[in-house]
Amino acid sequence: MTAHIAGTQIPAGCGFSTVLPDLDFETYSEAGCIWNGTSWVAPIGATKKGIAAVGAVVYSEHPSTEVLSLSYDLKDSLGPRLWIPGMAPPVELFQFIQAGGLLEAWNCIFEYWIWKNVCTARMGWPVMGTGG
C-alpha cells in the first residue's frame, strides 16, 4: 500500500523531505585503504579507495568500521533525530523497526549492511528486516 509513495520528495526548507520514515548513517572505516606512511591510498591494482574499492558488505564487515552518527526521522511529528555513539540507544527507532515499519534511505543497501554488521553484530541492536 505504501510502495507507490516510496521515494516521493516533499519540498522542505532549502531541501526535500521523504514521505516514509528514513535513516542515514555516517561511518568511518579503513576498509579499502592502505596507509603508505603519509596518507591513505587505494590498494594495489585498485583505481579507487574506501567503500568504492571493496563494496558495502566488505566495508561493513571490516573491524575498523564504526558508526559516527545516525540520523533518522520517523515522520511522527517529532522531527529528525541524531544518534551518536555514547548516547542512549534510539529505542523509538528500534520499536518502529520491530513493529515492521518501513524505512527509506538514500543508499538502502549500505544502510542495511551497516545496521546488520556493525549495529546488530557489534552493538546488540535488533535485527532489521528487508521488507521483502
Give names to the regions the model predicted:
Residues 3-4, 20, 43, 50-132:
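Conserved DEDDh/DEDDy metal-dependent 3′-5′ exonuclease domain
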Residues 1-33, 37-44:
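N-terminal accessory regions of nucleic-acid-interacting proteins
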